[in-house]
């Protein structure tokens, strides 16, 4: 007696592929901060704390140049300097990472596994041509600093 041929076994292979993009964002950074005048150091300054949220532990952060929105004219022969500073909280201490100025940005490699809490600050001061600190002129001051994650 002849039996019909048995069915052939078959196999098939499927490949699953995907990608996870590197992400980086800032959480808790306000749109604006008040600056306070410090008479002892003759500086006007403000700061804000924020967290860096990223799926990459080693990344670069750029602190853009300090953009002047408004400031009074400096006293004759003086210059008004402005600085942006980025600090990272590591083991309960604020460690300065990078500084920018009116004319140049700054960028730095950071390891957020050491701490994801950061502080952005802006300061200004006035000095004469010899570098001696002078009183800053009265008036309204406003600066903008942009920070960017460089992945």
What are these model-predicted stretches?
Residues 76-92:
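Short, surface-exposed beta-strand/strand-loop-strand elements in extracellular ectodomains
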Residues 2-80, 106-151:
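N-terminal small/polar-rich segments of proteins
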